[in-house]
């Protein structure tokens, strides 16, 4: 419906945004999610095969499976989901509501806005070697979507962060060989994982960097790596090359909205309120004194931001939602799966 006004519009469809959408349904708010990419999931789409250990009550789970479950949960109360739109413009109206304008020119109308944009639009740092892009359709990879495609292959990984170290550890049992190349002696990954890698069969080459790719047609067959201290060149035979040199983050026009942004993150208070009334933040995009940079912390951010939005819209509403075991919004759903429980709270929460 044109010019339809929503209670809350969540910008960003990663873990923070998805859980916030679910909780918004618990609080009986008309909700919209706007996501710039073609899929929900945010940064976790980059590592669907990595194990996630730090979500409370959830046994170790693949990133891709956690995304699937978060998306399913987010859709519990049927929020409106908009994909392939990057929010570029924000205009606050005299009545306190907002008009959000996307890259397509479409306008979205909302009483409140929750920014769960993570680190903005993310793009992989590419290998800075002329002609490298021609191999991206064959055996040059910037993420690992499926471990199995590397089984029994000779794999070279370039990078020294968490993802590079994790991929080395995960591929080591199934690949024919794994070589990791890092331009520094020290790795930026978690200490325990770096130690595990160094004690395994992974060949660690430091301080080296990739300087040339050698191919026969469209497949990389050898990689030349150079010692940063001696300029010595070595050649490594490969079946696949994985590059993890970090991510480029782009917030676009969002940085021009007048938010207090410091060191690439928006500053919020304990209620997850920004300096603009009616705009809140959740997840990696924000910082505050008690910030926890875990997926579980992003969920808490979303809850607190949503509660603040609820109270701005309905000042007399309960400060928090009733737990799902006693929330009237789950009564019908529980009955559908054969559960009967009369202890529900008949209130708007």
Swiss-Prot record:
Catalyzed reactions: 2 reduced [2Fe-2S]-[ferredoxin] + NADP(+) + H(+) = 2 oxidized [2Fe-2S]-[ferredoxin] + NADPH
GO molecular function, one term: flavin adenine dinucleotide binding
Annotated Pfam families: Pyr_redox_2
Top enzyme category: oxidoreductase
Cofactor(s) essential for the protein: FAD
Keyword NADP (UniProt): yes
Cofactor note: Binds 1 FAD per subunit.
Keywords assigned: FAD, Flavoprotein, NADP, Oxidoreductase
Residues annotated as transmembrane: none
Residues involved in FAD binding: 35, 47, 87, 122, 284, 325
E.C. number(s) listed in UniProt: 1.18.1.2
Assigned protein family: Belongs to the ferredoxin--NADP reductase type 2 family.
Assembly behavior: Homodimer.
Protein name: Ferredoxin--NADP reductase 2
